[in-house]
Swiss-Prot record:
PANTHER family: MITOCHONDRIAL RIBOSOMAL PROTEIN L24
Record-stated family: Belongs to the universal ribosomal protein uL24 family.
Origin species: Frankia alni (strain DSM 45986 / CECT 9034 / ACN14a)
Keyword Chaperone annotated: no
GO biological process, one term: translation
Function, as annotated: One of two assembly initiator proteins, it binds directly to the 5'-end of the 23S rRNA, where it nucleates assembly of the 50S subunit.
Organism lineage string: Bacteria, Bacillati, Actinomycetota, Actinomycetes, Frankiales
Subunit structure comment from the entry: Part of the 50S ribosomal subunit.
Protein's UniProt name: Large ribosomal subunit protein uL24
Gene3D superfamilies tied to this protein: 2.30.30.30
């Protein structure tokens, strides 16, 4: 089974287009290409109840922790750096042969 490459990479600024965090802009912390999901900072926060565990020094850690959960890539769009609006991603090959991502709306390089 082959894994499709994601057009959204770590460090990109994206906007959430559906769900409870719709309209929120954030930076991609991590990409999961095998699941087609991305982790966006400050978005899709969930609450986890962790069990209290003894550490080596005798301190206890546990309780209620809030953290980000991955979001499917179809629910986010990359933000165009030229005007700050969401756009689709295209590809162009430069004169030197390198493949670069471009904004479909403005044609600017991402």
């Amino acid at each position: 089974m082959t894994v499709a490459t994601l057009k959204i990479k770590k460090g990109d600024t994206v906007q959430i287009i559906t769900g409870k965090d719709r309209g929120l802009k954030g930076k991609v912390i991590r990409a999961y290409p095998e699941q087609n999901k991305v982790l966006v900072e400050g978005a899709n926060r969930i609450t986890r109840h962790t069990r209290v565990q003894q550490s080596a020094r005798g301190s206890q850690s546990g309780g209620i922790v809030t953290q980000e959960a991955p979001i499917h890539v179809s629910n986010v769009m990359i933000v165009d750096p030229s005007d700050g609006r969401p756009t689709r991603i295209g590809y162009r090959i430069n004169e030197d042969g390198t493949k670069v991502r471009i904004s479909r709306r403005t044609g600017a390089e991402l």
